[in-house]
Structures are given as structure tokens and as C-alpha cells.
Amino acid sequence: MATYKEQNKLNVPHLRFPEFHGEWEKCKLGELAVKVGSGSTPKGGNAVYTTSGHCFVRSQNVGMGHLILNDIAYIDESTHQKQKSTELRTNDVLLNITGASIGRTALATEEINGGNVNQHVCIIRTNGNVEPSYICDYIQTSKIQKYIQSLQTGGSREGLNFEQIRSFPINIPTVEEQVKIAKLLSLINERIATQSKLIEKLESLIK
């Protein structure tokens, strides 16, 4: 087993699945993505939203590691066609890039496939060298969250630009190790979500 100093030298975490060995690759997020970009709010704002059609994802729909779809908006086919460049695909990584929720990230699910995003949500579409779920989880780590905060230099409104997002420092293991890490974190998140729902039910009974 590698010592603490050896782990630092090899650029690997101090806790690791025992069957994996070797150094993790250092790279920038831009090297792992085929798309980094956001959308825009349709002309007319809320007035153009419909009750069905293409999902329109806003920053309030992106939680930390999960989507919040109870108040999802919709746009019609005509509006969608005007924003075709921001069409969502399943497993796109969604990142909030402005305001108080900056840094929150979640994976696009089948439920919002074919939808669009506004200007406050960035789409990160990974290439075949990295698992989208791994990138989504990695952005949630304290390392990247602190990096995001370090990029905010005053002003009345926080924000990330695409160049800054592409500069995120990412350490990646083999795809096999990425998948195992992502599965473990997904299981943990599911249990946290279950416990949160139980707490909400108990609190509603107490009121």
C-alpha cells in the first residue's frame, strides 16, 4: 500500500479502492469536453412558457447532485428550434454559473432529454475519455467548489465564463475506476435523499 507521501506524488486520493493502482491523469475540464456552453431566456420571458413541450431548465432546477423538476418550465417547438444549439442530451453535466447557486451541478436525465437551458445554466458534454457522472461528482468536491469561489472577484453578481469552466483542474483515473467511484457516490446520494424524505415526513407530522 502506498504511503501518504507516495499518494501525493502519484496524484491519487488517500482513500482508494484496493484493486486500482497507478497515477491519476491531471488535465483541464476543457480537454475532456466536446461542448461547454449555455442558453438564453426566450424573448418574452415567462409569457412564452407552456404547460408541455420541451423542458426548459433554469438554475432553480439544478440541485447539488440532483435535478429539481417540480417547477420545470416548458417551451413549444418553435421556441425550441430557435435554441437548438442548447438542446440537452441525457448525461450532459449541468452547472449553475451565476448567482447564489453557482457551482451546483447535476446530470441531465432522460426526463429532460431534448430540452433546453437558459443563460444561467452551462451544459458540459464530455468526450469518450471520461464518465459524465464522474465529472458531475468531481465538480461537487470541495476542491472545485473552492476553485469556483476563487474565480469570483468582487462585483455585485457572481458568475463563471466558459473559459474559466474549461480551466477547472480535473484528476482522472481509468474509466473502470471512474465508474466504480460514481456508483458508490450515487448509492450514498440515494441514501441521503431517502433520509431527507423521511425527515420531511416526520417534520410534517410534528407541525
Regions found by a protein language model. Name each.
Residues H14-S40, S167:
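Non-catalytic DNA-recognition/assembly elements of restriction-modification systems
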Residues P42, R58-Q60, N70-Q140:
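A short beta-sheet element
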Residues G45-V48, C55, Y138-I170:
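Specificity-determining recognition surfaces
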Residues R16-P18, T79-H80, C122-N127, S167-I172:
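Short, well-ordered beta-strand elements within core beta-sheets of diverse protein domains
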Residues Y49-L67:
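Short beta-strand/loop turn elements enriched in aromatics
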Residues K9, G114-C122, S133, T153-E176:
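A short glycine-rich beta-alpha junction/loop motif
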Residues M1-G22, T194-K207:
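Short amphipathic coiled-coil heptad-repeat segments
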